[in-house]
Design a protein with these regions (language model features):
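Short, structured patches in soluble enzyme cores that scaffold and shape functional sites
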Residues: 105, 121-123, 144-148, 159-161
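A short secondary-structure junction signal
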Residues: 114-121, 128-131, 152-158, 168-172, ...
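Non-heme Fe(II)/2-oxoglutarate
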Residues: 201-202, 206-265
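Short, surface-exposed loop/helix-turn segments at secondary-structure junctions
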Residues: 120-125, 172-181, 233-239
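Double-stranded beta-helix
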Residues: 136, 149-206
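Non-heme Fe(II)-dependent double-stranded beta-helix
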Residues: 1-16, 23-128
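Short, conserved beta-strand element in jelly-roll/cupin
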Residues: 129-151, 188-189, 221-224
Length: 265
């Protein structure tokens, strides 16, 4: 008999720590294809941004480094990953049996030694702090390492384990450190690893202490179906929504389609 996913051990770890690392979750071949697609898409996005030409999503350029948002329509591989079968039991098991897509983005980053940390929690309305503590699980984010991040110092995703349960924010002095504050950890894992984390978990990009390498990641976020919290959810072209399969349409609100689709029958 197959063990249901997530396992009881994984659930316990996620509930107590606010994150879960699934090492080598994507195959090496899959990672290679995603990297090839992302490099092509980033080059296209940078050209459009530099020429001031309109395009779907947001493109942020910082020297040789780039971050792009709204990636589902940039390449079929990115759309395919939004409901990747191996991931789906984790999304439905940890968040909601009928999850919605919330947001997607990609990061291609090269050594940035002058940069400090960027600690934050996710969520609109000041990270949902007005709901009181502990902030509930309203968004589940998944980060995929596409480059080897098994060693620290390459901008690795950093987290403060258990901070999703805290009624307090980290001390201001700790948030402004150029390195990790006590208790925070860098997520070190090989390429293809997936990191799932709670919206209220304090997290940040990590410090660069190496001269070589790159931090290349994909991020996908999911939310409850009764939430309307992300502009990306309705920010694609009509053609994009019309091309979605019936299964993928369920990841989006029914009002996006023509005619609108009923969801709760």
């Amino acid at each position: 008999m197959e063990t249901p996913l997530p396992t009881a051990t994984e659930r316990f770890f996620f509930d107590n720590n606010g994150y879960l690392v699934l090492e080598r979750f994507l195959s090496a071949d899959h990672v290679a294809r995603l990297l090839e697609a992302l490099r092509r898409v980033v080059a296209q996005r940078r050209t459009l941004q530099e020429q001031g030409r309109p395009h779907t999503g947001i493109t942020q350029i910082h020297g040789d480094s780039t971050r792009i948002f709204y990636i589902l329509d940039d390449d079929p591989l990115f759309l395919e990953l939004v409901d990747w079968p191996a991931l789906w039991p984790y999304i439905t098991g940890l968040l909601n049996a009928r999850p919605h897509h919330h947001a997607s983005d990609a990061i291609v980053e090269y050594p940035m030694k002058e940069r400090g940390m960027g600690w934050h929690i996710d969520g609109h309305d000041d990270g949902y702090r007005r709901l009181g503590a502990p902030i509930p699980l309203l968004q589940l984010k998944v980060g995929y390492y596409l480059t080897d991040m098994a060693e620290p110092g390459r901008g690795n995703l950093c987290v403060a384990p258990g901070s999703h349960k805290s009624a307090l924010s980290p001390a201001t002095d700790d948030l402004h450190r150029t390195a990790l504050f006590p208790g925070a950890v860098q997520i070190c894992a090989p390429a293809g690893s997936a990191i799932l984390f709670h919206n209220a978990l304090w997290h940040s990009h990590g410090p660069w202490t190496r001269e070589d390498g790159a931090r290349i990641m994909l991020y996908y976020a999911y939310e409850h179906p009764w939430m309307i919290a992300s502009q990306e959810h309705w920010g694609y072209s009509r053609e994009f929504y019309n091309r979605l399969s019936p299964e993928r349409r369920r990841l989006f609100h029914g009002f996006l389609f023509d005619p609108p689709e009923h969801r709760w029958g």
